[in-house]
Regions:
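Short, glycine/acidic-enriched capping/hinge loops at junctions between secondary-structure elements
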Residues: 15-18, 44, 171-175, 201-204
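N-terminal amphipathic alpha-helix/helix-capping segment at the start of soluble metabolic enzymes
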Residues: 131, 139-178
Length: 208
């Protein structure tokens, strides 16, 4: 019977790094992809462009993927305890930084269930976040913004919106990130009105 290999991923923007780690995982057994749900992602990163079902449709059709299951929590513990894989594969980029605590959790759980953690060298010069920044720079339509807002409200208990009446507050909303207990907190969007815009310029609302 083939060994079970667990690999967690967001799977929104597929690039060579994803394919590389899937192929490496397949060397150890049947690859089970734990695909993060919107709910799992929302409190840590910006929502993916694609819904979970769309991402699942893409990932399950990639060579060497045996199964795709939802990962409803940023922590790997629930799925690892449920599936009890023989191996879990992860890039070595989590040895430091905000995901270091996840690594410690995974090592503890895999030790308890008799599994092994295999760390693969992180693919350099290409990341999903870097590609996402390039896509964001192209801009979005009002329909895309509305769709994202609806998904955010459904996925998060609190949606963080910053009032933005000038370029400075816009930059604050776009770039502010704070690490709290292993979670990355940032603004989900920005909002502006003619009233705040006109007030900042010392003009009545009708002239803004």
């Amino acid at each position: 019977m083939a060994k079970k290999v667990y690999l967690g991923m967001i799977g929104d923007i597929m690039h060579p790094g994803y394919i590389n780690i899937i192929n490496k995982a397949a060397e150890y057994g049947d690859v089970i992809i734990g695909l993060f749900t919107d709910k799992a992602i929302a409190n840590h990163r910006r929502l993916p462009y694609l819904t979970w079902e769309q991402r699942k449709n893409v990932v399950e059709n990639i060579k060497n993927v045996a199964q795709v299951v939802p990962q409803d929590d940023w922590s790997y513990i629930p799925n690892l305890m449920k599936l009890k894989p023989d191996y879990i594969i992860h890039g070595d980029d989590w040895k430091c930084g905000p995901e270091k605590y996840l690594r410690e959790e995974v090592f503890n759980v895999m030790s308890k269930i008799g599994g092994e953690v295999i760390e693969i060298p992180y693919t350099k010069n290409i990341t999903a976040s870097g590609i996402q920044q390039e896509i964001d720079a192209l801009g979005v339509t009002p329909q895309m913004r509305l769709s994202s807002l609806r998904r955010l409200i459904a996925a998060k208990p609190v949606v963080r919106i910053l009032e933005s009446h000038n370029g400075l507050t816009g930059l604050i909303a776009e770039h502010t990130k704070v690490e709290v207990n292993g979670q990355t907190r940032e603004f989900d969007g920005m909002w502006a009105s003619s009233l705040t815009d006109s007030t900042s310029k010392g003009q009545p609302d009708i002239e803004a």
